[in-house]
Swiss-Prot record:
Belongs to the G-protein coupled receptor T2R family. Keywords: G-protein coupled receptor, Glycoprotein, Membrane, Receptor, Sensory transduction, Taste, Transducer, Transmembrane, Transmembrane helix. Residues 29-40, 110-129, 205-234, 286-307 are cytoplasmic. The gene is TAS2R41. This is Taste receptor type 2 member 41. Residues 1-7, 62-88, 151-183, 256-264 are extracellular.
Amino acid sequence: MQAALTAFFMLLFSLLSLLGIAANGFIVLVLGREWLRYGRLLPLDMILISLGASRFCLQLVGTVHNFYYSAQKVEYSGGLGRQFFHLHWHFLNSATFWFCSWLSVLFCVKIANITHPTFLWLKWRFPGWVPWLLLGSVLISFIITLLFFWVNYPAYQEFLIRKFSVNMTYKWNTRIETYYFPSLKLVIWSIPFSVFLVSIMLLINSLRRHTQRMQHNGHSLQDPSTQAHTRALKSLISFLILYALSFLSLIIDATKFISMQNDFYWPWQIAVYLCISVHPFILIFSNLKLRSVFSQLLLLARGFWVA
């Protein structure tokens, strides 16, 4: 029975990963084609293509890691493959967190109806900062990755020089990750999460007040403008829930509370990668350009299937 449940959750994780890879790859291909065609991208498209690319790679790396680790537990735990994975995973995950934060800030300054002078100044200046913020996010993520590598490297150096046993290396490495990394990761990931939370809550509150004002002025729930604001609210709330779930799951995952040997490992991995697999579809259906191309592909697929 336990083996059947494990196989079920592994299959579910595989399907979720394939959907996430396909959706993020779709975003990158569509916006990349536009970039090649026109030689430039709008600030929103810059963030979307960066977010799609980082999520695509993160989902791919995570999927390969999980299945390779499940097949080669002993060799992988004590070898350099684990270090190689963590380098890529920390870099991509940090970049993804920052890109999500800048996406929420851009949504906030473009949509929120706030008349404070500082916000109006930010509304005017922020779109021009987007390329530099994205570049800075990549640089920060690279520095953070080097920091994790610098902290974790001695265990692998001792393994190579003194030829420690696999078990001792694994225990040493696990001790470092259990007692040092969680607090460090909490501090590092809390910065983009705080930026995201402030901007998304400001935007949700602004849209909520605007929707209530429209209803108070006689607009019905069936009014197109009211429906548009309601859809935007639902999309933002979904983004907030998925991002918060991703943040909490990554913090818990950093404590190594659920190991590969745990019965809940595969359900937990589904929770960890849920945001980067599901949120791309929310972005596709809420973006006119992406939704249009996606609808065309569905029509082509339907015509091919009927033929």
